[in-house]
C-alpha cells in the first residue's frame, strides 16, 4: 500500500461570535458527572462573510467529569444573518484545564486561553 500525504486544508475566516449568556442552571452531580446548562440569551455575529445576531433561546449543556478538569460541551442555538437567513448551530466541544483554571471557568472568571485545551466541532444547518 502506498502512503499519500494529504495537503493541509485551507482555512478561511468567516466570522466571530460574541454570545451573551445568563447564569448557569446547576443540574447537579449525576452518575455521569456534574451537569450544568447555560442559557444563551443573544449575541452578535461579525465578520468578512457573515454578519447578524444570535437568537435568544439556545443553551450550552455541560458535563464536567472526573476531578473537574474535563468538560464535554454541547451547545445548540440559532443565528440569524443580516439578510434574514436562519442557521441552526450545534457545537460539540472538549475542554481540559487544570483544577484551578477549571474552577475559575465555572465561576465565570477570566483564564489565560493558552492554559486551556479546547477543541470545538461546529455543525451548521
State the predicted function of each range.
Residues 1-125:
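Beta-strand-enriched cores of mature, soluble protein domains
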Amino acid at each position: 500500500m502506498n502512503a499519500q500525504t494529504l495537503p493541509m486544508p485551507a482555512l478561511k475566516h468567516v466570522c466571530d461570535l460574541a454570545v451573551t449568556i445568563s447564569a448557569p442552571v446547576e443540574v447537579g452531580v449525576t452518575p455521569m458527572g456534574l451537569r450544568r446548562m447555560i442559557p444563551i440569551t443573544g449575541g452578535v455575529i461579525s465578520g468578512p462573510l457573515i454578519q447578524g445576531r444570535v437568537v435568544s433561546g439556545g443553551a450550552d449543556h455541560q458535563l464536567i467529569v472526573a476531578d473537574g478538569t474535563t468538560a464535554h460541551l454541547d451547545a445548540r442555538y440559532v443565528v440569524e444573518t443580516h439578510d434574514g437567513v436562519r442557521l441552526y448551530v450545534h457545537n460539540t466541544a472538549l475542554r481540559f484545564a487544570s483544577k484551578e483554571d477549571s474552577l475559575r471557568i465555572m465561576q465565570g472568571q477570566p483564564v489565560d486561553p493558552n492554559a486551556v485545551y479546547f477543541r470545538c466541532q461546529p455543525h451548521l444547518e
